[in-house]
Amino acid sequence: MSYPRVKRLSEEIKKIVSDSIRNELRDPRISSMTSIVEVDVTRDLRYVNIYVSVLGNEKEKADTMEGLTKASGFIRREIGKKIKARYTPEVIFKLDESIEKGIYMYNVITKVNEENHLSEDDSNDTEDDSDE
């Protein structure tokens, strides 16, 4: 069952957090290649899970998550200023690696397709040689 108010609130929080990360946070630990993938607000509106994707190496990911965790109080205040709700939800950042996994799977599939194409070409060449 979908809750329209929770969905609207999630979308609004996503905009606020994206804007805050892009324009207001000055923490050098936070990578410029950080994006908000998804925002889930609990039904009781007390907590918000913010799924973040960071393109970069493991150190950049860890540094970005540390910076975002330290800035969660600031981001919570920004959310509180801009939404009308009885409670301002507690912000919880979580690393989402689905984009990296998708890129990895795409590369694996591409490699397998190339290998299959090459093996088909080799088998066609041997058949052509045997016909002569």
From Swiss-Prot:
Entry's SUPFAM superfamilies?
Answer: Ribosome-binding factor A, RbfA
**Per UniProt, what is one GO molecular function of this protein?**
ribosomal small subunit binding
User: Which keywords label this protein?
Assistant: Cytoplasm, Ribosome biogenesis
What is any Pfam family matched here? RBFA
Q: Name one GO cellular component term.
A: cytosol
Q: Which domain of life is it from?
A: Bacteria
Gene Ontology terms: biological process: maturation of SSU-rRNA
Subcellular location per UniProt equals: Cytoplasm
Q: What does this protein do?
A: One of several proteins that assist in the late maturation steps of the functional core of the 30S ribosomal subunit. Associates with free 30S ribosomal subunits (but not with 30S subunits that are part of 70S ribosomes or polysomes). Required for efficient processing of 16S rRNA. May interact with the 5'-terminal helix region of 16S rRNA.
Subunit architecture = Monomer. Binds 30S ribosomal subunits, but not 50S ribosomal subunits or 70S ribosomes.
Q: To which protein family does this belong?
A: Belongs to the RbfA family.
Q: What is this protein called?
A: Ribosome-binding factor A
Species this protein is from: Alkaliphilus oremlandii (strain OhILAs) (Clostridium oremlandii (strain OhILAs))
Q: Which lineage?
A: Bacteria, Bacillati, Bacillota, Clostridia, Peptostreptococcales
